[in-house]
From Swiss-Prot:
PTM characteristics: Phosphorylated by sty1.
Subunit structure: Interacts with csx1.
One GO CC term, this protein: cytoplasm
Source domain of life: Eukaryota
Originating organism: Schizosaccharomyces pombe (strain 972 / ATCC 24843)
Compositionally biased intervals (Polar residues): 34-62, 164-192
Post-translational modification Phosphothreonine, affected residues: 431
Name under which the protein is recorded: RNA-binding post-transcriptional regulator cip1
Protein keywords: Cytoplasm, Phosphoprotein, Repeat, RNA-binding
SMART domains membership: RRM
Length: 490
């Protein structure tokens, strides 16, 4: 038949013989008969499928030619009988397209190491397909050379005994499903490895948790299993949605290891839990995370300080949006941090301007500074100094009213104004504190004279401490004090 009918067919120069045969090439009637039949067209079988390469003899006996799993593509042939090949046909390997020529030639070619291999046409519906599949499942080794030669003798080109018996073939799907179930059971029951260097020995990750399972319910399973409960157990939410992931922390590595071995593979609501050790981040990543945490903490601290600062000054009645108040605060801030090379800073205002006086008082208390006033007519100078460079001759604090400050002694004014400012009052009271114009020593001396008489220890101490005082002055003062209290002189 010309090659134009089959364009895919290999074109061969018919004038030359194959395999060194100088004789005229004869057509392969068996191969042509198979190709001409539309029902017996060759089909490619998948790689790895068990094929029973078996032909039956006239007596009905069968034996496997190659009962192992075929690792290459094989051509499926039909059950139709084909004419017997001639002895003069050239052979390719241990078989021809139509099968073995005879027992002796097939045996010799099967054992030949220098032969060229060709695809083997196997029958898909052979009688012994079940035997070949069973041998393939049990990893039966291929027959030896002697066995193959004896088996090849029983083969013939006739189509007797080629009835299909596909009902006896074992199910591959059932076998694969059994292997998958066994493998999954072995993996779930396998003991996990101990924590490595890149893991945290006291932290674990629980995966594949049912989405509807609550955290308290999962902790109840810890109690039922008798395993240690973590001191920290948190569900992980991705954008507010639970994805079946949780983190647990323990005090000791032994507790974590017991939980991993017990809880791994544990089934809850039809889902098997997977427990793993929590991995550490690389050193570079950990450093980045720590820096980010420090930066966030610093930002939160600054915001909190600004919030407290704003609330405190708002309660005191100060408005930092005011230009004058903001300028006063800026100057005091620079002076408090010693950014201004000066021992003191001065503010000038009128005695009737209470806003500036109130602002300086509050800012000085906030920055821990001292201030005092220098009146000059209607102009009032407020001098602010550092605590270690204060002027001891003048009061350290200044009330809102400048006239009040100069009517009181310095120590008493300082104490009164400090207590007054701590109570939260913005301005000094209208009524000044009582003035101690009369010395206390006279009152105490009169009381001592009433008790001890002339032998008063206070009188003796005052007499010794003041040698320049005359005796007459002392007697006069003593008699005056005694008369005031109604004490007679003995």
């Amino acid at each position: 038949m010309p090659n134009e009918i089959f364009p895919w067919k290999i074109r061969v120069d018919e004038s030359r013989g194959l395999a060194g045969n100088s004789g005229t090439k004869k057509s392969n009637h068996e191969a042509l008969s198979r190709l001409q039949s539309p029902l017996n067209s060759p089909k490619l079988q998948p790689i790895g499928s068990p094929q029973a390469s078996r032909k039956t003899s006239g007596s009905g006996s069968s034996a496997p030619l190659y009962p192992k799993w075929s690792g290459a593509l094989s051509l499926a042939s039909s059950r139709a009988a084909s004419p017997a090949p001639s002895d003069s046909f050239p052979t390719f390997g241990y078989s021809q397209l139509g099968g073995l020529e005879n027992s002796s030639k097939g045996s010799a070619l099967f054992n030949s190491a220098n032969s060229i291999g060709t695809p083997y046409l196997s029958s898909r519906n052979s009688n012994s397909a079940n035997e070949a599949s069973a041998m393939a499942f049990h990893n039966v080794s291929p027959p030896s050379g002697a066995e193959s030669s004896s088996e090849s003798k029983s083969f013939s080109a006739s189509g007797k005994g080629n009835k299909a018996d596909t009902s006896a073939e074992p199910s591959l799907d059932a076998f694969n499903s059994t292997q998958i179930k066994a493998g999954s059971t072995a993996n779930s029951n396998s003991t996990p490895v101990e924590p490595g260097e890149d893991t945290i020995p006291t932290a674990i990750v629980v995966k594949n948790i049912p989405f509807s399972l609550e955290k308290d319910t999962l902790l109840d399973h810890f109690k039922q299993l008798g395993i240690p409960r973590p001191y920290a157990f948190n569900y992980h939410y991705d954008n507010g949605i639970f994805r079946g992931l949780a983190f647990a922390n323990f005090y000791r590595p032994e507790e974590a290891q017991v939980v991993v071995q017990t809880l791994n593979g544990y089934e809850i609501n039809g889902r098997r839990l997977r427990v793993e050790w929590k991995r550490q981040l690389p050193a570079a990543e950990r450093e980045k995370v720590e820096k980010a945490k420090k930066r966030q903490a610093e930002e939160r601290r600054r915001k909190q300080q600004y919030k407290m600062f704003e609330v405190s000054f708002t309660d005191q009645g100060l408005n930092l949006n005011d230009t004058g108040t903001l300028e006063t605060y800026s100057r005091l801030l620079l002076f408090a941090h010693q950014c201004i090379p000066s021992r003191e800073i001065t503010f000038e205002t009128t005695s009737k301007d209470g806003n500036l006086l109130n602002a300086i008082r509050i800012f000085c208390l906030y920055f821990d500074l001292d201030y005092y006033a220098r009146p000059n007519g209607e102009v009032l100078k407020l001098v602010v100094t550092h605590p270690n460079k204060k002027n001891t001759s003048v009061s350290q604090s200044q009330p809102a009213s400048p006239n009040l400050r100069f009517n009181m002694p310095a120590p008493l004014a300082t104490r009164f104004l400090q207590e007054h400012s701590l109570n939260g009052t913005k301005s000094a009271p209208i009524t000044p504190p009582p003035s101690f114009a009369v010395p206390l020593t006279n009152q105490l001396r009169s009381i001592d004279d009433k008790i001890y008489g002339n032998e008063s220890p206070l009188q003796k101490a005052s007499t010794l401490s003041s040698p320049f005082n005359s005796k007459n002055d002392n007697d006069a003062s003593t008699s005056a004090s005694k008369q005031s209290f109604g004490v007679s002189h003995f």
